[in-house]
Amino acid sequence: MTQQLKLTIELVPQTCWYSNLRNEVTRSTWDKIRKSSYAKYGYRCAICGGDSRLNCHEIWHYDDQNHIQKLAGFIALCDMCHHVKHIGFAAILAEEGNLDYEKLVQHFMKVNNCTPRVFEDHRTSAFDQWRERSKHNWNTNLGEYQSLIES
């Protein structure tokens, strides 16, 4: 039986990097989206409840059959939870000396009340999925958020 995790790793396929709403809308529009997200979650991290600096994280759903990534919404995340979501990028920051990778692992284990083995298994599975998804070109569907893009 697989443990249900509160905080998960969500690696964006390499072929989808930079295909997101934030890169398509004006700064003022993105500010409205992120501030709305922060307010929705009471100015706290939606996953761990932390009240440190927040990030607006895009939630994507992937149709692995038709290779469509669809924007499903937004969630307010603290820096630690956000770095776990994007742990591949976080590893690069850690290699550059800009982030303590072990603190991210500890945060993952604390939030999920789990062992290092659970973290390692989850990370391995996430990277396996990322490698498979990165073999394909994806169509981006912004769904209800498409109208926010100025022509």
Where are these regions (language model features)?
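A boundary/linker detector
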Residues: 1-33, 52, 98-151
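Histidine-centered nuclease catalytic patch
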Residues: 26, 34, 38, 46-76, ...
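Histidine (H) residue identity feature
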Residues: 57, 61, 82-86, 107, ...
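Short leucine-rich amphipathic alpha-helical surface patches
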Residues: 82-85, 89, 112-116
